[in-house]
């Protein structure tokens, strides 16, 4: 594989220069365009290096598997992987030695390529134009100020404050390292042209990474700039080391030089507190472990609570980093260069990422989520995205039926109340209707004890797709599921672990020109299921009117008393799932949409399941609705039409008799799959 092919097989590729010195040990350092990656149990970093110009590594590949952060496991491995600082990029570096200057390289073809495949399955490549440089003269440090205080090295990183410089100025920075086995230096010019500057200075003969950071709040020429130099220590076993740092303005009339001989190294990382478990998301479809993911906007639900975390997103040309300050509040965080990506992060676990840029179909967007404390999870998405076409939050696009839940609960002993926020639907006739179920937020005090009474009220607005009568049924079922409950059946019945409540209220939509009345009965046995008259096997004949009302609405209220220790203490309500499925009402078919939101309790979760059964379309004759509990229709449940009715009535009836049981069975299986997926995504 040549250098170009290797680079093309990377998700992210950077270009730069690799400098080396003849007859001297040189360090080729690859700096990853990413924040510092965490320590992982059994993390694998696959590192490949190839060069066409260096004698001792010409046309060779070095593949490192099971590379760990820090020193390599095997001394013969030429590449070392390490993390500089707690938040700074990780680096992969290679020590090379070119013993002879007789080897000449073509400046147009002398290249080196390093490829790193990280534990998130993101590939990073650096393509270097290789250049040889002459050794620099040893710096005169006789006039430098020797500092007796310690120079701390925390997690292989040191930061040294420079004297104040000014915007639009240029100065020179030099670094010298003297140790028992190393004595060399490097220097570079730094130009402060922007409010924020981060200049990397290549030091090929030093096992150091050197960069200068500067920032100012004033863009006027001559404004004071705060500057510092960051030193990354690649080697950890240096003895009798001293570091000299000097800086001077462009006119060289002034020079500030400091020597540090007391270098103290510490490592603040506690491995047991910085372990990560990786969860791969290879595509939009399929099992996503602890995550839910939808397009436009990207919705990433992280099911575990975490007070501090990082969210890292990359496209091909830039990287973005968000970090939660752990202040316990919802925060919209933006940083670095993210012109096409914004993120809203809730410390209660929900992350919404909006991608609005003109990403091409061939572009990759890498999405990585890192939690910073404890054994948390990380995920990655490598997928091409197009600009977002969804409306802003809080609005409903044409063809979207939205039911939004807002939980409001006081800390005194009162009932938590579900307050519906209805949304109008304006679907033109014949277009697909969509039921969109979203959850609001509940901010009750953790562990506050409330009366064991919960009232749930849902309001749904529906636009019929034709002037004929449409009848729909909305079914609400409540149950409690323990937090450690992994799988449930569609009925959510698990003996000894789940308290299942019967359906206590049902309603229907009608085209009678007025809002239908909810049918509410007392809770009965599961066989009776509190069915309203609409769903009884003996239909009541009615005269169908072709009303031209805009929409019909209905409200379903459920009042029930919860018992048991697992449901009488309210925790917090967090957004859980937004499940969107298309519904196209068709005569004689059932369509079921399941959505749920979660009310977290101390030892259990309260799930609200919404089942929407699409309308039967009646055309001058009576048709009973199928029983949604069984998701099937018996032939004897349908009345026979009298003679003299529509000539196609008998054929239509026989069609429904055979079609409905098949459709019911199919959609029962669909409901089972949706419920299980929804529950997995809320874990």
UniProtKB/Swiss-Prot annotation:
Compartments, as annotated in UniProt: Host membrane
Biased composition annotated in UniProt, kind: Polar residues: 407-420, 512-529, 543-556, 621-630
Keywords for this protein: Host membrane, Membrane, Transmembrane, Transmembrane helix
Bias (Low complexity) ranges: 531-542
Transmembrane found in the keyword field: yes
Record bears the keyword Transmembrane: yes
Renumbered residue ranges of the record's region Disordered: 407-427, 509-556, 621-648
Membrane-protein topology: Single-pass membrane protein
Protein name: Uncharacterized gene A8 protein
Lineage of the organism: Viruses, Duplodnaviria, Heunggongvirae, Peploviricota, Herviviricetes
